[in-house]
């Protein structure tokens, strides 16, 4: 078994190397610019097969993401060793409210919609302002960072009665980390829930003629019901419907890009634009219009879709609904890879439609939101009706994340005060003040607060991966699978902390030296802590 796991691991590395080599040798070739129906640039090809480098890269990226699940995902599964004989929290602690066995497909959809939000769309579109290097980060980060983070954090929660992230961090990083993470996670989750109500409301208002405040109240009303009712009552029934909008959005954009090189062979009624997919393949230069440093800012901008600490706050929700431990990889790892594919498609779509990061930067400059760029892409490629369907998908993603966030916040508060949540009155005791705070916060200006959302997100991911490293070290298993991405993300958040003008404002070089030294110290401390923990940490449920 160990030999097969090792071979699968090196096979995954080989795939990554091939992917990197093809990216390096792909030549940069651009076509002439035409005006799309909305006046945005669309790149014409001299013929249907005149330049297939970008098209091949696009297909290859999606295939590598899928292959990463079936190869590296199996390696992670062998490292963790799921046990079919162990009872899961849903079976051992069933209460009909939060601990409920649900079909795997339904749990997968809820997990996907809970973690996705606007990150794999807005974050991916804004991330490609740094150039095609963003596509490399999505693929490599999703497989070797995001899937590791989501699978292990979800499975550790599963082994500990569906514990929330603060309890997991406290168990492996210490009691101080537990209390700090409780405060951070609760505040962080409330902010995410509020923004994922205000954001969709701002999109829906001009589409319907209703005011933004009216939509905020409607969305909060749905959030409240989804937070207090049994998980299968609303989320278990509504999410399959939400997933239809998500599928239409992804399949629509993906279909246009796959058929674009063959547009002249397509029926007229399909309205497939003739364009060059990914005309700009300059992977190794920072292209950001404002000259923001690619490292670390790009790795903070693209969080969801690559690796995101926010996911670890959501996984315990579904860890309480799995029937067997074998369902962990398709639910936690599979949802992460699916989100990575969504992010990759939207990042590639933005580069294809606008042609260059500079053109995309002009379209999103002067306060123009990425939602405008997304609407232009969808309307140009899919027409007015298709644009509406895509924008509905864009609205559904944050709403389906916001309800899960606030439900998890209720559970985290319940864990803090040891409040049993079987009775409705106990749930209302937490939910009413929680939503009162959320409504009060919804009127605040997020222009400054949201700048640090991505940084806090990656800080949470780094802490989670260090906790996973300690867990694996305590079991004498391959802790490097988590320690390496933990070290990288720690370097990202520390470099941003030291070098960002909004934070410490040190010189880039001095910040990098300090960050590397601190990461080395953190890594040594975590590995020593892991070797000192006893192995018998997982009670039979």
Kindly label every feature range from the protein language model.
Residues 193-217, 225-227, 246-284, 469-479, ...:
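Hydrophobic alpha-helical segments and their helix-loop junctions in multi-pass secondary transporters
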Residues 64-65, 69, 111, 145-161, ...:
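Helix-loop-helix module between adjacent transmembrane segments
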Residues 53-73, 127-157, 166, 511-519:
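Extracellular loop-to-transmembrane helix junctions
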Residues 175-179, 186, 216, 334-343, ...:
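Loop-to-transmembrane helix boundary motifs in multi-pass membrane proteins
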Residues 119-125, 161, 188-201, 300-322, ...:
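Membrane-helix boundary/coupling elements in multi-pass transport proteins
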